[in-house]
């Protein structure tokens, strides 16, 4: 599930972060998912076993909220409308809720794989 990322490289260099932040904000607004009330993690495809496991670990409230946001966005898409501006997802509300769980599951899988391939040396 993990793809190559430049996040750490950009975060280490303050000048690069300041330079790319306006471009990042413009791109997020141009994507339009916030105008439909979605969060960035709502866009992660559910066709992966890791993501399905992460979705099962969500709290019932967060799971319900996610389904509600996706259904509302689907209805808006079908009617070719956007939410009123006061209902758009703000930058403060758009926090990752699924990505930390995915990272945790991937780390657990890597640890399990490392332990499964562990070679025991007997002296």
Curated annotation (Swiss-Prot):
<comment type="function">
    <text>Component of the ubiquinol-cytochrome c oxidoreductase, a multisubunit transmembrane complex that is part of the mitochondrial electron transport chain which drives oxidative phosphorylation.</text>
</comment>
<keyword id="KW-0496">Mitochondrion</keyword>
<dbReference type="Pfam" id="PF02271">
    <property type="entry name" value="UCR_14kD"/>
</dbReference>
<protein>
    <recommendedName>
        <fullName>Cytochrome b-c1 complex subunit 7</fullName>
    </recommendedName>
</protein>
<dbReference type="GO" id="GO:0034551">
    <property type="term" value="P:mitochondrial respiratory chain complex III assembly"/>
</dbReference>
<dbReference type="GO" id="GO:0045275">
    <property type="term" value="C:respiratory chain complex III"/>
</dbReference>
<keyword id="KW-0999">Mitochondrion inner membrane</keyword>
<dbReference type="InterPro" id="IPR003197">
    <property type="entry name" value="QCR7"/>
</dbReference>
<keyword id="KW-0249">Electron transport</keyword>
<dbReference type="InterPro" id="IPR036544">
    <property type="entry name" value="QCR7_sf"/>
</dbReference>
<keyword id="KW-0679">Respiratory chain</keyword>
<keyword id="KW-0472">Membrane</keyword>
<comment type="similarity">
    <text>Belongs to the UQCRB/QCR7 family.</text>
</comment>
<dbReference type="GO" id="GO:0008121">
    <property type="term" value="F:ubiquinol-cytochrome-c reductase activity"/>
</dbReference>
<comment type="subunit">
    <text>Component of the ubiquinol-cytochrome c oxidoreductase (cytochrome b-c1 complex, complex III, CIII), a multisubunit enzyme composed of 10 subunits. The complex is composed of 3 respiratory subunits cytochrome b (cob), cytochrome c1 (cyt-1) and Rieske protein (fes-1), 2 core protein subunits pep and ucr-1, and 5 low-molecular weight protein subunits qcr6, qcr7, qcr8, qcr9 and probably NCU16844/qcr10.</text>
</comment>
<keyword id="KW-0813">Transport</keyword>
<dbReference type="GO" id="GO:0099617">
    <property type="term" value="C:matrix side of mitochondrial inner membrane"/>
</dbReference>
<dbReference type="GO" id="GO:0006122">
    <property type="term" value="P:mitochondrial electron transport, ubiquinol to cytochrome c"/>
</dbReference>
């Amino acid at each position: 599930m993990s793809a190559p990322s430049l996040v750490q490289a950009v975060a280490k260099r303050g000048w690069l972060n300041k330079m790319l932040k306006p471009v990042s904000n413009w791109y997020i607004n141009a994507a339009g998912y916030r105008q439909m009330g979605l969060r960035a993690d709502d866009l992660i495809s559910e066709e992966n076993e890791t993501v399905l496991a992460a979705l099962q670990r969500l709290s019932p409230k967060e799971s319900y909220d996610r389904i509600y946001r996706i259904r509302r966005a689907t209805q808006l898409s079908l009617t070719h409308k956007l939410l009123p501006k006061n209902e758009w997802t703000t930058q403060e509300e758009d926090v990752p809720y699924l990505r930390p769980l995915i990272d945790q599951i991937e780390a657990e899988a890597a640890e399990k794989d490392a332990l499964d391939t562990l070679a025991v040396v007997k002296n």
